[in-house]
Amino acid sequence: MLDPIAIQLGPLAIRWYALCIVTGLILAVYLTMKEAPRKKIIPDDILDFILVAFPLAILGARLYYVIFRFDYYSQNLGEIFAIWNGGLAIYGGLITGALVLYIFADRKLINTWDFLDIAAPSVMIAQSLGRWGNFFNQEAYGATVDNLDYLPGFIRDQMYIEGSYRQPTFLYESLWNLLGFALILIFRRKWKSLRRGHITAFYLIWYGFGRMVIEGMRTDSLMFFSLRVSQWLSVVLIGLGIMIVIYQNRKKAPYYITEEEK
């Protein structure tokens, strides 16, 4: 088992979980700022947004997790804020981040669809890296399997939990998001019929479908009346993505690739 603590500075312990999240954030900010001028968005506005959105998204991710595990946390109030042990629900962070983005874009007079389109691939790569935090914490894993011989030794050893090998669902989602990120990079440079909002829709459909399938493999899903919450939200995301495509096509939204770029 790998040590979840990356750096120990006296009483201060810096965990791999936190490093994975921060690394994903830094890369996401860099990529978003790089694409921002293409949509006539000031890069400094991206930094301003992150300073507001990131802490609120972390809070939203934790609140979401605590709400659906309230039976446990109501008896362990001191652990509610112990986010270094894991327990950040991605969907809670996404919902909070989307609300903050809408308000921020409105106040800065930025087109919301443009902002979402340049942020979507960055969010996907951040999620891909962030999932490795689950790896170090030995969480977000799946059912038992006989062996994991097809995986590198360090992953196989870390997925040996409670006397059994476990499906590395964190890895499946990380790779799924990485592939989605790569496809978006190709689409937004090559797909000339791509309209404003289509990248956001692709993210919602791609991530929603992948999460719905992978969530079914997990053994630690957040439940609500015997239903997997994330799977229901995944269906909502897929439906929302499809509606965005239909809506933007019908209103003949501007193309993502401008005439000057074609």
Curated annotation (Swiss-Prot):
Enzyme Commission number(s): 2.5.1.145
UniProt superkingdom: Bacteria
Pfam families: LGT (PF01790)
Positions contributing to a 1,2-diacyl-sn-glycero-3-phospho-(1'-sn-glycerol) binding: 131
Protein's pathway: Protein modification; lipoprotein biosynthesis (diacylglyceryl transfer)
Molecular-function annotations in GO: phosphatidylglycerol-prolipoprotein diacylglyceryl transferase activity
A biological-process GO annotation: lipoprotein biosynthetic process
Record-level GO cellular component terms: plasma membrane
Principal subcellular localisation of the protein: membrane
Mode of membrane association: Multi-pass membrane protein
Family affiliation: Belongs to the Lgt family.
Record-given protein name: Phosphatidylglycerol--prolipoprotein diacylglyceryl transferase
Organism: Streptococcus pneumoniae (strain 70585)
